[in-house]
């Protein structure tokens, strides 16, 4: 028996994301005074009292007939259809607005169990009987920010969705356990959301020609070739110097934080926008965090056939020149909107993930080390003594990290370390991931 689904619905800035965070067991939504922050359906495991459920945060609904408004309405409508219970939220400070009446009627026409949640009621006298005119048979007053009124909300929820029918205590949580966490990152308007929608074959994420549509990191559970995958769409990352709005700073921070906890990062690049320093900055950040990386050039269908060969030649040159620390990184050319080569991206992610987790036997490591250092020894130091790397062992995976023992580690140059790392990539088939070396001084300096 699966968990019941509760959707939070209402006009912008009534506190849906604040309540989402209050009820969420794990992932948090961005909260800001600016209305309309949420633009995609956002899911989390929720809990109130002993009652556990799947919670959906939705875009704020407005009477808006432009293209963006229609796409936001589509996202919310899908959440309503998916939900077992609707929490229709209004603002207790501003009172009932015309949009509340219109949207209340819109929600009620689906004949789903619903609760009118009057938020921002920090004081008892905030309650207004006018709210009954919205036509909902159940109503509670709460303050999502301060956590008041949640007991009343709990009582109404279990009345609408009896607890014994909603929870299976022995059921495995699909979020927990072994899964591959893939973050899709890149500059604005590279096609990140379109790519994920194409993969899962669902208009799950809001897309459009406007740059910067995605404002929060959105997690989507998915399965591919018997692998449990969590896809994470992130806000587009611009240069720090161009970010002035506080909301964009929050979105950028959310995206950067997602990279920190990723297993593999897909760096999405727009084929119509030449490779920029910001793309390389994002890639370097991924590598510095020790994550696996797959570089994807999107909108390949829009590049003229006569220019593709020269484009690829220059692109590979730039990547190899500026990202030598992940030599051999997979580069794929796709069209997300046409679903061209998109499965190859996932196959590359699975391969990179396997390499990222690679464990090499100590005996094989030292056999390789002896051969490699003898083939290209470090130069003699003053007094005729040679710096030697005598022994190594792997200390961790994710990414592969190695400890090397030397009689004089401070004399080992960066260029020699690059030589060892690149040789190791070839010897053990480890392209496209960061490899980390740390040096330790042996107790006997003459060894």
From Swiss-Prot:
GTP-binding is among the record's keywords: yes
Binding site for GTP 1: 10-17, 57-61, 119-122
Gene3D superfamilies: 3.30.300.20, P-loop containing nucleotide triphosphate hydrolases (3.40.50.300)
Chain sites annotated for binding GTP 2: 186-193, 233-237, 298-301
GO molecular function: GTP binding
Keyword GTP-binding listed: yes
GO BP: any one term: ribosome biogenesis
Domain KH-like, chain residue ranges per copy: 358-443
Organism domain of life: Bacteria
Keywords from the UniProt entry: GTP-binding, Nucleotide-binding, Repeat, Ribosome biogenesis
The EngA-type G domain, residue ranges: 4-165, 180-357
NCBIfam families the record matches: GTPase_EngA, small_GTP
Subunit structure: Associates with the 50S ribosomal subunit.
Family: Belongs to the TRAFAC class TrmE-Era-EngA-EngB-Septin-like GTPase superfamily. EngA (Der) GTPase family.
Reported function: GTPase that plays an essential role in the late steps of ribosome biogenesis.
Name of the protein: GTPase Der
Name of the gene encoding the protein in the UniProt record: der
């Amino acid at each position: 028996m699966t968990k019941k689904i509760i959707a939070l619905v209402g006009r912008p800035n009534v506190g849906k994301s604040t309540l989402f965070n209050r009820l969420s067991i794990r992932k948090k939504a961005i909260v800001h005074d600016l209305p309309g922050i949420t633009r995609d359906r956002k899911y989390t495991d929720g809990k109130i009292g002993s009652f556990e459920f799947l919670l959906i945060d939705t875009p704020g609904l407005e009477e808006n007939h432009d293209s963006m408004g229609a796409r936001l309405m589509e996202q919310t409508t899908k959440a309503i259809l998916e939900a077992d219970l609707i929490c229709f939220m209004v603002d207790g400070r501003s009172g009932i607005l015309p949009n509340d009446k219109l949207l209340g009627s819109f929600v009620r026409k689906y004949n789903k169990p619903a609760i009118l949640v009057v938020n921002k009621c920090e004081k008892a006298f905030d309650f207004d009987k006018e709210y009954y005119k919205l036509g909902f048979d159940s109503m509670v007053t709460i303050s999502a920010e301060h956590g008041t009124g949640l007991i009343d909300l709990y009582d109404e929820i279990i009345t609408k969705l009896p607890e014994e029918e909603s929870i299976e205590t022995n059921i495995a949580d699909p979020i927990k356990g072994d899964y591959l966490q893939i973050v899709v990152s890149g500059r604005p308007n590279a096609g990140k959301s379109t790519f994920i929608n194409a993969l899962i074959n669902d208009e799950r994420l809001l897309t459009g020609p406007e740059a910067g549509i995605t404002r929060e990191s959105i997690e989507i559970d998915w399965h591919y070739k018997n692998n449990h995958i969590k896809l994470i769409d992130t806000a587009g990352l611009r240069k720090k110097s161009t970010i002035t709005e506080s909301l964009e700073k929050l979105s950028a921070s959310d995206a950067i934080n997602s990279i920190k906890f990723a297993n593999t990062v897909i760096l999405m690049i727009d084929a119509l926008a030449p490779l920029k320093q910001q793309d390389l900055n994002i890639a370097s950040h991924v590598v510095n965090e020790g994550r696996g990386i797959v570089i994807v050039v999107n909108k390949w269908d829009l590049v003229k056939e006569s220019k593709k060969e020269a484009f690829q030649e220059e692109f590979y040159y730039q990547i190899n020149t500026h990202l030598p620390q992940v030599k051999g990184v997979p580069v794929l050319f796709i069209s997300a909107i046409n679903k061209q080569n998109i499965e190859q991206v996932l196959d590359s992610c699975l391969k990179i993930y396997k390499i990222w987790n690679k464990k090499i036997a100590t005996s094989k490591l030292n056999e390789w080390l002896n051969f490699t250092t003898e083939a290209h020894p470090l130069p003699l130091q003053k007094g005729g003594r040679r710096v030697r790397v005598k022994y190594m062992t792997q200390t961790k995976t994710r990414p592969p990290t190695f400890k090397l023992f030397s009689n004089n580690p401070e004399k080992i140059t960066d260029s020699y370390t690059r030589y060892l790392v690149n040789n190791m990539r070839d010897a053990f088939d480890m392209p496209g991931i960061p490899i980390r070396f740390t040096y330790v001084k042996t107790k006997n300096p003459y060894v």
